[in-house]
Amino acid sequence: MDYIPAKHILLRSKSTAWFGTDHTVNLYRGCCHGCLYCDSRSDCYRNPNFDRVTAKSDALRILRDELARKVRPAFIAMGAMSDPYNPFEEELLLTRHALELIDAYDCGVSVDTKSDLIVRDIDLYQSIQAHSPVICKLTVTTVDEDLVKEGIDFDKTD
């Protein structure tokens, strides 16, 4: 895993209108899923090696310091520019430790991922949910036409 320097981890959102969150956190840069529809691949983000995942150096210390300076709790989006549960997360635990900080500072969280690794941190989502909003959004990619049907009840699928 390569690391890149970071000045900030907790970034204020320009508008809450699109996603309902007032801050974003991206502990990683790049994504290995290769989704053609991903707008994070856009040239405007100046990441020519988007398919290569790198971690941000000292991300947890920076996040802790930035959360400590907050006057009021934030509602934080994770996964806007990189999947927080990429394959490297299983070993690095950056997302898990960031969730511990988000919980400790009474913030809410909205997470976007394609990974079932999210269930590893269900205890933290439950703890955060006791004091703040939690939204977990999972993208399911399939070639099974039956799963694509509008209105499918995923609780009833095998």
Please name every model-derived segment.
Residues 1-28, 39-55, 59-75:
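N-terminal [4Fe-4S]-dependent radical SAM core
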Residues 29, 33:
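Cys/His-enriched microdomains
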Residues 36:
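Basic, often amphipathic N-terminal segments
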Residues 58-76, 80-158:
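Conserved AdoMet/S-adenosylmethionine-binding subsite of the radical SAM
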